[in-house]
Structure formats: structure tokens, C-alpha cells
Amino acid sequence: MKKENITYGKVHQVIGPVVDVIFTESSQLPRIYDCLSVKLAGEELFLEAAQLIGDDIVRCIALGPTEGLARNEKVTNYNHPIEVPVGKNVLGRMFNVLGKPIDGKEELPKKPQLPIHRKPPSFDDQSNTLEIFETGIKVIDLLTPYARGGKIGLFGGAGVGKTVLVQELIHNIAKEHSGLSVFAGVGERTREGNDLYYEMIQGGVIDKTALVFGQMNEPPGARMRVALTALTMAEYFRDHDNQDVLLFIDNIFRFTQAGSEVSALLGRMPSAVGYQPTLATEMGQLQERIASTKTGSITSVQAIYVPADDLTDPAPATTFTHLDAKTVLDRNIAALGIFPAINPLESTSRLLDPNIVGINHYKVALGVQNILQRFAELQDIIAILGIDELADEDKIIVERARRIRNFLSQPFFVAEKFSGIAGKYVPLSDTIQSFKEILDGKHDDLPEQAFFFVGTIQEAVEKAKRLKKATVEEK
């Protein structure tokens, strides 16, 4: 950094996370998004320029706590946006919003670094082909396929397997696609981030992952920008290393919430439900950078908190417009012991189209959904009258639906140490063929238990033989 590029100002006023800085000359004023710093309790507090007020004052958002900051403190303007480390060095490491390591390991080299505010790929560079991103997880690949370079919303409460699903996706892209993952913890619990870090070490996927955290105890400035820090790291892998990158954002709602916290202090008039008037713009600036190019892709999985379960709330509603697929984790399915506990009827994807996935995949997926839908409709009758009162045709549907429901379960690699069952990666072609055979009634003679926690249909057949043998031996 050249010395002549640096200019100096003074703290004019402090209102919570918003700091006004005054400069003596207008030529010294920073540009919007420029990075500034001020000494506070022996450490550097970083600020980001957000508004220019009058001829000599710039209003900034603090990226750390402002307690103890006094007027007339000297402020350094670096004349460039926040820059964070990128490249292979960030893998296996954990960072804060400024790209500084928070895992207690050695500092990273100064280069390469990139600014966190960047333009999305141009139309010429973006890939215009819709392509399925194979995850190896049956229920996802069949019923709610993910797009390469797409955006997926992950809806799930506490304890339904959201973290395990995230880890399995990271594992599968690392092992099967030689891909990389970047995890952004936005405004969530510090304990959860800590648990995730150590679980990734145990699962053997940390070396293919970079983690960036701006947790809920941090100021709104950090929570607003941490997703951009993670995205910048992912963009480097996509653009320079031509990699397929998986970007996890947990939780995208906290990104919106942080913007809402500082919006009023920046003097903006609140819009619907008290959100910032720039909500759609801020969301668009983040989401448009998550894209697939001709050489690599960023596929994002975004956990979404829905305030008061109101899907019409402006924050989730603004996010929905950008999503390609919706994966819903259901507590009732988890209660049955079926994992991943994905609701096959509520989860959707715009890729489930015969022109994209092919007519065979589409027909099988539709057949599975129809049977499960009919099974759901028959549940009340079964509960009141019993299964014996159903028509023969409905009895067959119920039996097949139970087999399908069990077969949608799958042993995960990252859960091997808990379940004692070896993890399975199931190619899409095997998934389609397996469910087609169940729909055609080829395996109506197999017990329902044989379909539980297996990979392909061949494994279910083998498991049925083992169950039969065990039953004979018991007798």
C-alpha cells in the first residue's frame, strides 16, 4: 500500500455502530465502501464508508464494537475497500469478516487478496445452460434437484439434521467432485460455529473448506459484510482455479436483519415491517454474484429463518425470488427415524422439468410424489378405520409409499461414527432406476425394513436376504 494514498480524518460523532468522520479537505474524503480504521483500546477498529454528508463528513459503519471510542480520535483512510485473503491458503482455516484468522493458527501471506465489493460476472461470462448438480443424496437428486451455479433455500428448525446435511454436501463435493466449500456463519450462535468446525475436522472435510464467521454477538456491520467476505473467497476459486464451489450461508435472514439495524442510524426511512428501503438492492447485490460461469460455478445453500413462520415477511419473500430450489427439513419425518428428514412434497425445484432433467427422471419423480401424496391423503382413513378397510388398490399404494418413504433415507458418510452404517453416494442414474423399479412393483415382495438406510435397490435386495436369513436362524 503506497503511503501517499492514505489520508487522515477525525471522529466527529459516534451513534452505536455508526461513526461520523470529518476530513479537513474534500479531496481527502473516502469513496463509498472504502475501508477506514481508528485505534481503540490498543487495537484497530475498522470502519466502512457508507454515506457522504455535506462537504467534509463521511458516515461509516463500524465492523467491531465502538464502546470507548471518543471524538477527535485520528482516523486512517486507506482509499480502498476491505480486502480479504483468497486462494488455497484459506482452506482449512477460520476467519472473521476482515479475513483475519480466528483459529489460533499462523497468519496468512499478504497476497493474494481481493476486495469484498465486486461486480457479478458479465452476461458473456455466465453459463446459460441449466445443469443438474449431482449431490449423491437420493431424495435431493430425484425430487428437488440442485442447479450447478444455483441457489438453494434450506428450511429447517433445530435438531432436524440441517448441520449434518450441510456436512454431507461438503463431503460429497470434496470427495466425488474434487470441489471446494466455503461456509459463512452470518449472525448465528458462536457455539454452533465452534461445533461445526470440530465436526468438520472429525469428518475429514476441513481441508477442502474455508469458514468465515460474523456471529450474533458481533456488531451489525460485521454481520452485514461477512457473507460478502465468504463469497469473495468462493469467487476466487471459481474464477482463478476453475472450480465448482459450494457456498453455505447460515443464516441469510441475519444478513437482512443486520442491514435493518443500521439503516435507521444511516438516516433512511424504514419501509414495510421496519426493514431497510434498500432491502431488495442489498439482497440482489449478494445473490447476483452467486453464479455459474463457463469455467466454474458457485452453488449456494442458504439456511433461511422465517420470522413467526410468515412466508410473506419481506425478508424471506425477497430471498425466495432468487432461489432455484427449496429443501424443507421436517421434524415429523425426523421423528420416524428417516434421515435426511427432507419433506418430499414440500421441497421443490425449478429444475424438475422434463426439458432439463429428461422425461424418464421427470416421470419417476412425479410417480413418487403422486404415491406419497395419496399416502398422505389416506393417513386419516387409516388412523380411524385401519388399513384393512382400504380398497385393494389403495392398500398397494400404501405399501409402496412406505417402501418409498424408507428408501428416501440414506446413510451419510459424516454420520458413520454415530449410526455405525457405512455412508453411500448414489449416482443419479442408479437413483432413478431404483425408484422406477419400486413404482413398477418389482419389489413388492421385499419387507419394508429392507429399504431403510440403504443406497441402491440392489442393496435393499441384499438386505432383504440377510433379514430373511436372520429370521430363519432365530426360528
UniProtKB/Swiss-Prot annotation:
EC number(s) from the headed UniProt entry: 7.1.2.2
Catalysed reactions, as listed in the record: ATP + H2O + 4 H(+)(in) = ADP + phosphate + 5 H(+)(out)
A single Gene Ontology CC term: proton-transporting ATP synthase complex
Any matching Pfam family: ATP-synt_VA_C
GO function term, MF aspect, one: proton-transporting ATP synthase activity, rotational mechanism
Family: Belongs to the ATPase alpha/beta chains family.
Protein name in UniProt: ATP synthase subunit beta
Gene from which the chain derives: atpD
